[in-house]
Amino acid sequence: MTPSLSFLSRWTLMSLCLSLAACGSLFGAKSSRPSTPASTALSADATRSPAGAEAVLEIDAAWWRLFHDPVLDGLQTQLNQGHLNLHRMAANVRQAQASLAAAQSSLWPSVSLNASASKAQEKAGSPAHVLSVAAPVSWEWDVWGRVAALNAAAQANLVASQEDLALVRLSAQATLVQTYVALRTAERQGQVLAQAEQAYARALSLTRYRYEAGVVSAADVAQAEVQLATAQAQRIDVHTTRRQLQHAVAVLLGVAPAEFTLAEGTWPQLPVLPDTLSADVLQRRPDIRAASQRVLAAQAQVGVAQAAFFPSVGFSANVGYRSSELSNLFSASSLLWSLGPSMAMNLIDGGQRDAVKAEAKAALDGAGIAYRQVVLQALQELEDNLMAAQQLQLQAAAQSQAVQSARRNLDITQAQYIAGTVSFLNVVSAQASALTAERSLLEIQSRQRLASAQILKNLAGRWPTDQALN
């Protein structure tokens, strides 16, 4: 059964942005929460799901299991281990983690150790040696929220990088499913063509027998030979396509094509789609979550820019020793210490702080627009694939009827040809129609599986519990 998307109201769309609502006042930045216009509501004829009617099963890590194909399951495991883009994005996550750790270090006092040895001379005196050892301590009191904003930006960037990794993983998984389905489709196309070859070879033998008996002309034999050779050429082409798709699978797995082989197997099952899908599951999409985190990071950077207009307040302390003689350096008489607050403020900077603040606000506006674009794109992708699944189901039913009719027509035409009431040209036409109908049905069924994979990708692997793993 094909799904329909439950009515996506103004509040459902705005809920995608709800997590950003409180960020405006957090660091002194005015909220610029991205909004999604109500005109983007989907499927006006869709039914509304009752509240609480759908339980959602978390199967993000193994959504391809809905195709019930053990070989595909094994390939997905290899993908998670060998796909090169995943390793690259994982490195980006580690980089963001290090950036967050660096930002968090600003919350703690900084302790240093200084040591020096110098020789100085005053006008009236003789040269003297000066030895010193000190341990200065400094700490910034985050009165204006600058350090907190830096930490919030680093945290949001870390989460965004993690969502980017999840998006790359999800995209790679979907690409593998699509390539695998195309490969298995090529195998089935090859099987159909092989069966057609056998039928055409029998027809050619029959035609040659009838030609030798003087019943038909040499033209009929030539037509039968052309029909057989054409099917053979098509099967070779399909075999080439299958090999190329196998190479594509190898590259996805991070393996050299020459080192990877995949035996022929069964076609993945078509997932059972639920009656309705809640649009709320779009909030789980990694691209939407990453875009929302980048809005938070940009908003935090506005807070950092605003804090620069206020003085930096902190405390500093210094404990050490100073002496002209090494033997007396660490004695009580050489002890020096200081403790007190500090404040620093930039009075004239040529408009630099204003420019930095304007830059941060522009970046926030851009992040908000990018977020809205990602949401709208997600809605379009889901709507397109839901509509495709619905239409492909109808198309598959109609094409199945066409295949049955083409087979009946071929049987009737062959019987008429044997009876001598029609020419072999009629048989050739009926054979071509039957083969075309069967190959078209395979193509539609393949597109159904691809549409299901796209829907799962659009929903980030979430599926109603009662229909997820039937």
Language model segments and positions:
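A short glycine-centered flexible hinge/capping loop motif at secondary-structure junctions
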Residues: 211-215, 417-421, 458-462
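Terminal intrinsically disordered/low-complexity segments used for targeting and assembly
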Residues: 2-81, 155, 239-283, 325, ...
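Short terminal targeting/anchoring segments
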Residues: 217-219, 421-443
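Extracytoplasmic/secreted envelope proteins and their assembly/folding machinery
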Residues: 73-76, 90, 180, 225, ...
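Glycine-rich cofactor-pocket loops
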Residues: 216-220, 376-387, 422-425
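Periplasmic alpha-helical coiled-coil/stalk elements that build and connect Gram-negative outer-membrane
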Residues: 147, 163-278, 388, 392, ...
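Small/polar-residue-enriched beta-strand and adjacent coil segments characteristic
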Residues: 25-26, 62, 68-71, 75-78, ...
